């Protein structure tokens, strides 16, 4: 009314698109869609299909998996590490490394990520996992075959130690520190792959198998250490146990990238549960005197746990796993005498089908800035609930 302008002090924060967002690959109307949940101060921004919003195009294939991987990648810049984001559908020509701050530009298509001599072993329609948690490389599962990436999301078929034989099929895998914990369903045994540093380059178009996939780096049996737990042979598991999951767990030495535990859960019939604990420093080295197989916990089967349960663990919690039964999330304190299962969240109907912690890596660094997220990623658990009729809920 007075036509007098008054200055106000304001504070503006510029953020990259989808920086610190939860990305959710799902199917709708017969094709994949890339959903996003972003945190903007006290507000939450939900996008049903961020890929379509940014590109004006729909993904054509069906969803397979997402991947994130901290590595060198020259297309983004030299001398720094970046968090590569991969979107995988059953159409390889549209899958691969995407840049979320460049409108999901396809930087490296999946067809060019796999080393040419290994492409015959890579099943593009059955990619279950791309996991680069922690540091030192990533692993990928394609139709039971383990592929490894030393840098820049280049994928090589992992070599296999001779004493494991040729007939192995990796059902579960998880990066943890310098290595990856694996479960071979044919041999009914645990194995590990060592992703330690090697001569490589951040150029996604330059493959050098001699340096990047040397025969000295291979899938190995769990090593025998004098201080290993001896209650069970992890290289020859009891036939009555059924392994349900493996995952990276507590980081016992935050100053050591090898300082991760890895966990696995198996069940026997309807009465028993077993939690395995592996020390990844002991897996790859004898210098610090750690065991490779560090713990074996025999528990009464926790309430409701079965083959349909989802599992998750994180570097922040020692001796704790999370699992689901229907629409309920439980915390399992497996180091308590006999184990203790505590319900921590009950959803309004539906059934949990996927569960994962946001991040299992060091934060507050120049290449992992989660300040926009405003929460500790290592304590942020995302759960997908199937609500029926093609609908799902996502809860953090």
Briefly describe each language-model feature range.
Residues 353-396:
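Blade-level signature of beta-propeller repeat domains, shared across WD40, Kelch, NHL, RCC1
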Residues 13-30, 112-116:
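Low-complexity, Pro/Ser/Thr- and charge-rich linker/hinge segments at domain boundaries
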Residues 34, 66, 309-314, 355, ...:
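Hydrophobic core register within WD40 beta-propeller blades
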Residues 27, 39, 88-92, 141-143, ...:
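Short loop/turn segments immediately following the C-termini of beta-strands
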Residues 1-18:
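Beta-strand-enriched, solvent-exposed domains that form extended recognition/catalytic surfaces
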Residues 22-93, 385-387, 391:
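Conserved, compact domain cores that house catalytic/ligand-binding motifs in diverse enzymes
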Residues 18-23, 83-85, 259-264, 317-321, ...:
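Entry beta-strands of beta-propeller and related beta-repeat scaffolds
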Residues 79-309, 338-342:
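Preference for solvent-exposed, low-hydrophobicity sequence contexts
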